[in-house]
Amino acid sequence: MIQEMWTQWVLNIRASCLGALAATPFIWCFIFKSLFTFSIFTSLQISIFYWAVLGAHVTILCYCYITFTKEWSYYIEALGIACLFLTMLTFFISHLMWAPLYTLPFVFVLNCICLSLWVPITYDIVYLCPFITYKYYELGFLNAMLLYYVMVANRMYLSVIFMCPFVLFLGMGVFALKNFHEHPVFENILITCKPIFTAKNKYKTKGTEVNMKLVVHNLGAVLFLLAVEFASVVSVVQRLDIFVGMQNYLFLLFVSMLCCCMFSLPSNAICVVLETFAVVIIIVIHVLIDKLPISIIGGLLVIVILLMCQAIGCQIEIIRTKLAGDVGGPKLCLFLCTVCNIVVSVALTCCNKSEQL
């Protein structure tokens, strides 16, 4: 019993490290969006750093069409070293006054593309594990993001230790990923999955058509809830500049579906309750929008977004449960989470009149 508990605990710790590793592309975007979007740069540079988080999400969507076979594990260390090198190179270039004008944005984008690979690679394996394990993954992701929120808020970007956690996330994440495949719990999960392992290091899945038939109603529910969320956010943000000076601190909402759904359960009832609460708050906001302080309205809207993300998360959990026997299941869930993040990011960024470029 003790041995089993220790084995599960080790798996959960590794999942937390993988969550921190998956957060690195978004931390990378957050750092540059917070610190480098000033008037001393050209408008093109500002635009690149400002919209980088959307670019990272689109890159992840493209990666969802790649099958990460066992052969990828042989290149994990090389990818980690490449990301570390590009990280150091980027900050070295940022301190060079004589560097060509677009060198910094180019290296920044290149590193963002490389870092984005960690999201589908880690997501594919962690979400085949037990429920508690991938919740630790989300917790690790959230803690990594919050750590840099605190560091930026306290102006620790002037400190020599500012990039130390980022490098630590890379190192610990790569080490955990390298050893995750060999964990006995994960090996047993692969054996019990319905797909079989072939000689070419590829898993056979049930197929897209079969998967769609299983979850078609849940996909419709996700799209409906997403449309409601988009309409709710736009209807409020267009009326008031409620996010003046707060754009950097709303960055967590841009990745909310990857780290803020820890309380989502595979339950339609919970989904309905969460969405109902969110809609009621939206109605209250519109009724009292001229009477409440802007700060309170902004706080209520953040609560609405989080509640609606939890509701969508419930539907995605149901999809994940229905596709539990398919190795391709996590890929579909990641695709849906990324699409939801893109919609929220577009709504908050394009409608935020106070900080449009």
Swiss-Prot record:
Q: Which InterPro entries match?
A: Herpes_BMRF2 (IPR006727)
Against Pfam families, the record matches this protein to:
Herpes_BMRF2
To which protein family does this belong? Belongs to the herpesviridae BMRF2 family.
According to UniProt, the name of this protein is Gene 58 protein
- Origin organism lineage: Viruses, Duplodnaviria, Heunggongvirae, Peploviricota, Herviviricetes
The primary gene name is 58
